[in-house]
Amino acid sequence: MWKKRAIIWLCLCLAGLMVLLARLTQLQIVATEHFTKREINLLEASVSQRSQEMILDTGRGNFLYKDGTPITHQSKPVLILFPFLKKMDWDSKRISEITGVSEYALEYAVEKAKKPFAYGEPNPIELTKPQMEKINGLQIPGVFAVEKKYHLVQNPAEHLIGITGENETLLRNRYPDKELSSQTMVGLTGMEKSFDEFLLPDGKSKLVYHVDATGGPLFGINVKYVEPANPFYPVNIKTTLDPNLQTVVEQLVDQHGIERGGAVLIDIETNSVLAMVSRPAINKDDPFNKENGGTENLMLKEQIIGSVFKTVVTAAAIDYELTNPSRQFDCSKTITGEPDPLFQYGMLDFSTSFARSCNNTFATIAKELKEIDPNILGNYAEKLSLTGSVGWIGDIYHFEDFKQLQEDKGRIFLSEDAKKDNNFVALTGIGQHEVRATPLAVANMMATIARGGTKEMVRVASKVEYKNSTSLLDFKEQEIEGDTLSPYTAMKLQKLLREVVVNKNGTGRSLQDLPYEVAGKSGTGETGRTLGDKPLYNKWFAGYFPFDKPKYALVTVRLGATGNTSSASPLFADIVKEIYNHDHSQN
């Protein structure tokens, strides 16, 4: 009997050992980086448990203004102190003399510290180069003067640049073949998302020391400096943004109380974005809550553009010879032919109709174009780069059709039947019904007209640079494929857009006295939404300047505004003034 019991006992012991061995194999070999449903990385957890570190740079790539200055971060020379200093006699007096910080303050900060820190955080004291050299020359263990990268609390162009975050599931799905730490930051929106694979870190720069269970040094007081071995990484994305103009436009958008909307400024020569601002601002505590602002860049989302679309109707009307100067339109009537209770403009020619934005004129023209060919308005919207992708797209390395921007494409009609319906076509002719376009596309339309009809892709980045500032790749200027306006039609549009401003009754007459001569078009899109009993509108002004030698295309828009809210023209005017001052301060 005892033999049988012994055998059973031995079998149980062997089974237990096998279970333990299987568990140990799972922990140390099979699931070291993806343990349990929570996907715990045991290697990282082990290192974290027995060491403390001060991250100086996450290693993720950076975004730069066109002049090379950083947009999203700032490197500061700071004083790093390690908590094990409290257990040793260190020369706090000498550090005090060099930094100007009291000896008591230094020792008190170390005493309450549980991990390495930059003295003075969240607003650390910034050291001079001589101070850094003196501190490091003392060679005090646990005391370092180093450069540490800080992300700016208020990022300019925050919607355009986008945000990052830790999301291991997204990381594994996006890069299944890459060996990346579970704590690797990934781009979630904007350019951070578009350029994410370029920006992935090669490793962190950090100060590390090993600790025992009490937090004391495990292997003496040696602190290791760890940095990526590749001197070319991380790479930087050089944007086309101008630091001064971006700052000015941000300030003016806020000064004008734009709650929803913003502005887009394009360099016409290179067709590059110089400034882009979207409001509401991103709520850092809850960025994806749309009620608190959300992360959507409204300058890249399709919007109702109202009378701005009359520019497209006009281009088609010019080519199909529907703008005879002797022709008169009844601008005291609505688009249905009924007497207009609000606007009694009388009989106007086409040029004056455009300047005063007469709805009946453009509803009539749109219906006449429909009789010639129902596709004309859609075709001309494409010719003016108002619809379709307008951001830079191209093949680079192993990326096919790499897109710098995540943008809506806009639309004119939703169905073939709508193109043939007189009522829908009349509404389309004045930029209502289903007409949608992004503010970026509207700005690009103005740039296209100012260039004489050549339509180009809009760039927000000019190149990807290695860490040492040498070029990895360039995003060259590229034209958009497809039909274009003739130079003659573009010239006629230029004159009509200028008439909007110089005509004493033009909708842009408030812009007559600006230091730069402006050409452009206003728009008031009916959203179909209300605030209480008040209808809400999208208020636009889109144009370019200087008129004789076009340099800038600008769109300002106030979205979802009540009728008594200011138009977008005052913001447009103030931006033009500041750009004029900027240009002449450099001369």
Predicted regions and their residues:
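Asparagine-centered polar/low-complexity signal
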Residues: 41, 49, 296-297, 359
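Periplasmic/cell-envelope proteins involved in peptidoglycan metabolism and beta-lactam response
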Residues: 1-285, 378-383, 559-587
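Extracytoplasmic Gram-positive cell-surface binding/anchoring modules and repeats
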Residues: 302
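Beta-lactam-recognizing serine transpeptidase/beta-lactamase-like catalytic domain environment
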Residues: 59, 224, 267-296, 305-306, ...
